[in-house]
Regions:
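Post-DEXD/H (motif II) to motif III coupling segment of the RecA-like Helicase ATP-binding lobe
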Residues: 35-36, 43-103, 274
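Conserved helicase ATPase core of P-loop NTP-dependent helicases/translocases
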Residues: 1-11, 26, 157, 166-212
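Conserved RecA-like P-loop NTPase helicase motor core
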Residues: 68, 181, 185-277
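Conserved interdomain hinge at the start of the Helicase C-terminal
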Residues: 120-161, 168-172
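Structural recognition of the conserved hydrophobic beta-strand(s) that form the central parallel beta-sheet
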Residues: 14-17, 60-67, 201-203
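Short, conserved loop/helix-junction motifs that constitute active-site signature segments
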Residues: 27-34, 53-59, 215, 236-245
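A conserved SF2-helicase RecA2
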Residues: 77-102, 109-118, 230, 238-308
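Conserved helix/coil segment N-terminal to the catalytic DExD/H
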Residues: 3-36, 47-52, 207
């Protein structure tokens, strides 16, 4: 079921595009014949458009699949109202030997660190991310790291939220004879497959979040600020420990300018995730020093008893 295609007669299994089911007016009886409906990536069904698909597909049995069922906006209750609550959750797989290099980056250049505020005085994050991704010195840091790990024999994926950022990096990598390819939305399946064969893949976070399965990847570089990297990081954990040549490596660029308080909080959230997964976290400071991350436990203050004579 997709757009004007309605091929369901005599079929035991039917694949349907949620977008089409949500917005197209198919005959009601089309969906009455199904006994089981499986919604992949069901966390998307909390969206205003996509939830309409569940109102049309009301099978006796409804199953939702998702690696991230909890939505930031709290709208998981929308699809849970149709599908039901979580009934099974796999345990987190403990991946041994994963290393995280958190690399602090700082610059006073206004083209990079300018604080963009709206009329309410709140930061305009898209503009600030644009500035960060357009700043060549920072991008060159990402490229130098990529070249370093490529020459070690690692298979690298670079993720950024800006397509033009990826284009700039791809051009430099190709000029330096590093086999590289894009992995972004809108590309044809053949071209995506071609990119999968490259030593360096440049993709968007949205593409890495879903549908990417490239087992050979072992190194990920987070080239633009991001809060939730759970699914993105999972892309370098596909190779089994007993056959891998390199341990999984996460390169996390941490923008430390005081104007980037929101990005600082995002960085802390990522580090919290790394700690929960028991990854080894190495902090690369601006002064060149390197130290292992150790969370300092707060000592509870002792109560004081006051006696009035």
């Amino acid at each position: 079921i997709q757009q004007d295609t309605l091929d369901v007669d005599g079929k035991d299994i039917v694949l349907a595009m949620v977008q089409s089911v949500s917005v197209k007016d198919y005959p009601k009886e089309v969906f009455e014949q199904f006994g089981l409906a499986v919604f992949d990536e069901c966390h998307h069904l909390g969206a205003e458009v996509f939830f309409k698909s569940m109102r049309k597909v009301a099978s006796k049995y409804m199953l939702g699949l998702s690696a991230t069922p909890k939505r930031k906006d709290g709208l998981q209750w929308v699809f849970e109202s149709f599908i039901g609550p979580i009934v099974y959750m796999t345990k987190d797989v403990v991946t041994e030997g994963v290393e995280v290099n958190v690399i602090d980056y700082y610059s006073e250049d206004e083209n990079y660190c300018k604080e963009c505020l709206n009329y309410m005085g709140k930061p305009v994050l898209p503009k600030m991310i644009n500035n960060i991704c357009a700043f060549w010195e920072r991008t060159k840091l990402v490229l130098d790291l990529t070249k370093k790990y490529f020459e070690m024999g690692r298979k690298v994926i670079i993720l950024s939220d800006r397509r033009n950022h990826l284009d700039v990096m791809l051009e430099w990598l190709l000029q330096n004879d590093i086999p590289s390819g894009l992995y972004v939305g809108g590309m044809k399946p053949f071209d995506l497959h071609e990119s999968q064969e490259k030593d360096v893949i440049l993709g968007t976070f949205s593409m890495a979040a879903e549908g990417m399965d490239i087992p050979k990847l072992n190194t990920i570089i987070l080239a633009s600020p991001k809060s939730d990297v759970v699914q993105a990081v999972g892309r370098i954990m596909r190779e089994k420990a007993n056959v891998r040549k390199f341990h999984p490596l996460i390169i996390d660029i941490n923008d430390t300018h005081p104007n980037f308080q929101t990005f600082k909080r995002q960085s802390q959230k990522r580090i919290t995730f790394y700690k929960k997964q028991k990854y080894k976290i190495m902090l690369h400071k601006e002064d060149g020093s390197i130290e292992e991350y150790k969370k300092v436990k707060k000592i509870a203050k002792k109560g004081v008893c006051l006696i009035d004579d």
